[in-house]
Amino acid sequence: MNKFKNIAVYGGGSFGTSLASLVARNCNNVTLFLRDEIILKEILYKKTNAQYLGDIELPTNLQATTNLSVIKDFELIIIAVPSYAFDDSIKLLKTYGISKEHTILVATKGLADNPTELFSDRLNTLLPDNPIGFLSGPNLAKELAKNLPASASIASLDIDIANKIAYNFSSKTFSTNTTIDIVTLQIAGALKNIFAIKSGIDLAREQGANSRATLIVGALKEITTLSKVLGGMQKNSDILLEAGVLGDLVLTCYSLGSRNTKFGYEFEISRDKKKFLCEYKELVEGREALKLVLDLIKKYNLHMPIVAEVASLILI
């Protein structure tokens, strides 16, 4: 199978930089697109991104630029921006010449808003003719950048596209699986951060290891519930057991390196919870996703008790 000859990664944060670093080990022509000129110079001349990844050394062949006019020259474009920036990012890239010839890989996790829908549905409107893929897995950014062992699921309605993308990522330290179940992979990516908040709360309450394991079971059930009504989990899909669902869920819920687990823990130990919520400045993806997931629960009249409990605690 042929690899993509050149790859662009749009998003110069910790995850975008780590993904660019990962694929640069498999592909000679990888460019990270970012906005910050200071970080750009650091990546080009020092091969580090200290603001997001400390002193981790990036591959020598990794290139970087702030010049979006050349992004149209890349075959595969990886989107690695926060969920709130997804729409604006796609619209911006369209003005720089993205055409139906470009394959888009979405590494952003969450849901689109106004209206609430999957990123795949939003892309049906914004980029209806492009080959689209989704990537998700237990991928802490600093560990990826260090080339430590990890894995991911890659989903596309066209399994050949998923396999081609996987071929660019797979290595001795990074394993992949592919699926056509784009719905479940996206739902898991949005919900796992909500479950991680619950995990942090339970940790602060000293609920014990049994409780946290039970949370994983309940989380998988709620992922299945929402996925099925949106068209996922068809044809005996086994995606639940793969890196992009179970793997990512376990990592996010069990690691205090997860912003969402950390948020849940700090929320629970805070004395003044309203003040804590008002003053908490760090981005918490689960907090943002929660409001959108509640829209879907209401729309489809679903029973998702873990999501409901987290909402009752932090949406005050």
UniProtKB/Swiss-Prot annotation:
Keywords linked to the UniProt accession: Cytoplasm, Lipid biosynthesis, Lipid metabolism, NAD, NADP, Nucleotide-binding, Oxidoreductase, Phospholipid biosynthesis, Phospholipid metabolism
EC primary class: oxidoreductase
A GO CC term assigned to this protein in UniProt: cytosol
EC number: 1.1.1.94
Subcellular location as annotated: Cytoplasm
GO biological process, one term: carbohydrate metabolic process
Transmembrane segments: none
NCBIfam families: PRK00094.2-5 (NF000947)
Name of the protein: Glycerol-3-phosphate dehydrogenase [NAD(P)+]
The species this protein was found in: Rickettsia prowazekii (strain Madrid E)
